[in-house]
């Protein structure tokens, strides 16, 4: 495969900046996507409007706040083209492409972004909130995640185990590959489920990526810091147009790719357990959907009618139905994400300290 055989040389920008001036690389990664978004964003929104690439929404009867959500019908989607495009371009320019971790992150980001694009395109052309089939999504995500799992297990050193803070490593053997697939696929879809309110997914992603950006200094994967800063900067730029009331949505093009990238970063850092903590908001969103589906099917078999565990899933809609405004849900979820990120970084630091003793 390409990943097993290719060893792309470091880019010119990496040789100039990262090798001799690593701080300059981090500054550029942290600023350029944000600045570029300010100039590209309005033009992209205008193009998407001209192409009538509007976001289909659920039927009014199914919406937790029908009048408010119906106003969003027609808001341009596929804003992830700008967000993920800037991340990919920045990765090619500033990141060390000879690093297996960077290669894996770039692969998953590109594949899931393309998958998200196909899904968004299907929704727009069909004028429906249903895109490509869920089975097709899982298959494509599984192929990309399988490539990463095999590459790390067979072609890179130091992989094949699960690191549990304060407890050490558990060797997984060949089970490491399906474990990697579970992490990446789960993360990709969890972020996708979170992208249901203006600014919610992008804001939580900024916090999670910043937390993981602090971890390379702790766990020894500094080559991922520029990649994570690119995500933070691009999400900040996108949030300028995605905050309430949103002028553009990232669509599955952005959310599937961001989630896939975050999951791959956690795998490459060997911090899958911390992903559950730092990405706790994403986990809660995904778990709420699984609980809702399970409970509905269980009660339908037992009582003859399906009952809901939450007012509505994903869980951000549960709070909307409980009377929280959209901005209240977003800000409070951001606060929860920040608290979990601080907790995760604290656990990582203490784990390193205990290991060094």
Residue ranges and their predicted role:
Residues 59-75, 127-140:
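Juxtamembrane helix-capping/reentrant segments at transmembrane boundaries
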């Amino acid at each position: 495969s390409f990943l097993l055989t290719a060893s792309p040389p470091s880019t010119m920008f990496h040789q100039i900046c990262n090798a001799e001036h690593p701080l300059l690389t981090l500054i550029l990664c942290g600023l350029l996507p944000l600045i570029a978004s300010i100039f590209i964003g309005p033009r992209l929104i205008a193009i998407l409007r001209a192409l009538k690439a509007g976001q289909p929404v659920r039927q009014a009867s199914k919406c937790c706040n029908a009048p408010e959500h119906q106003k969003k019908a027609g808001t341009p989607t596929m804003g992830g083209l700008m967000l993920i495009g800037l991340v990919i371009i920045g990765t090619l320019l500033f990141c060390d492409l000879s690093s297996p971790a960077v290669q894996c992150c770039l692969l998953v980001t590109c594949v899931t972004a393309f998958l998200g694009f196909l899904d968004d395109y299907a929704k727009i052309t069909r004028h429906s909130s249903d895109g490509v089939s869920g089975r097709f999504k899982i298959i494509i995500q599984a192929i990309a995640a399988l490539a990463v799992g095999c590459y790390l297990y067979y072609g890179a050193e130091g992989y094949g185990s699960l690191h549990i803070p304060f407890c050490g490593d558990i060797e997984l053997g060949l089970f490491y590959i399906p474990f990697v697939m579970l992490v990446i696929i789960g993360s990709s879809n969890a972020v996708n489920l979170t992208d249901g309110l203006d600014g919610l997914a992008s804001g939580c992603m900024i916090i999670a990526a910043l937390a993981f950006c602090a971890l390379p200094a702790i766990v020894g994967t500094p080559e991922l810091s520029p990649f994570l800063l690119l995500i933070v900067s691009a999400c900040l730029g996108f949030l300028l147009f995605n905050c309430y009331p949103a002028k553009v949505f990232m669509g599955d093009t952005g959310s599937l790719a961001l989630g896939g990238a975050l999951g791959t970063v956690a795998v490459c850092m060997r911090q899958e357990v911390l992903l559950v903590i730092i990405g706790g908001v994403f986990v809660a969103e995904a778990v709420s959907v699984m609980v809702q589906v399970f409970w509905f099917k269980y009660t339908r078999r037992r009582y003859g009618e399906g009952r809901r565990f939450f007012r509505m899933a994903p869980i951000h809609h549960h709070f909307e139905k409980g009377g929280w405004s959209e901005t209240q849900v977003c800000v409070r979820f951001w606060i929860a994400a920040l608290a979990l990120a601080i907790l995760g970084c604290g656990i990582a630091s203490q784990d390193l300290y205990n290991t060094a003793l």
